[in-house]
Amino acid sequence: MPCYEHFVTLQKSVFVPLVVFLVSHLGTRTGLYYIDSTALPVCDNHRINRHKVFAGLAQRGKTSMGWFFGFKLHLVFNTDNEIVALKLTPGNVHDTTPVPALTRDLTGKLFGDKGYIGQKLAEDLLRRGLTLFTRVRKNMKALPLSLEDKALLNARNMAETIIGHIKEFSSLNLSKHRSVINAFVHIIAAITAYQINPFKPKLNLQSRYQLETTA
């Protein structure tokens, strides 16, 4: 009969090979990209002071859903909904911080939510050939966008849909783990499973563009 304890022990040995496999299967560069992040809590907020497994690694962070204690997973997708780049950070890292590293080799257009607003970031990316598009806050003046760019920005919520799918399908709940390395294996395995799935959701940019044109 399969032994759960033995399985958990073997997980540690596949971490490096799994990372290498995932890196070799990252998505192609299409010139159009979406960026988003998601919180990965490691425990309930009322247990933060007693939490030991991720002590020194996890940090308090805040999203639109409120405060949490754990990590943030940052992902960049292309228009085929393939993951092009990823980074795991403590929960207190701002969404804009890992963007330069995540997009180091990318050029074209990058679409994100309001969390990625930042003049310096946009200028730095533009200097190396990547234009950042975000929605604006209520107190900001909206920049004029072409119909195509507006349609692409409106399609940004596909990134949230994909992240939700990855977390739900792979039961990406770090609060169940009692080992740091096994938790990281779980994260990499979940992302890899999505990446090699041939039936990814497709983004019909043509229909979105036509909808914007006729609106």
Please place each PLM-identified region on the residue numbering:
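Short alpha-helical elements
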Residues: 1-215
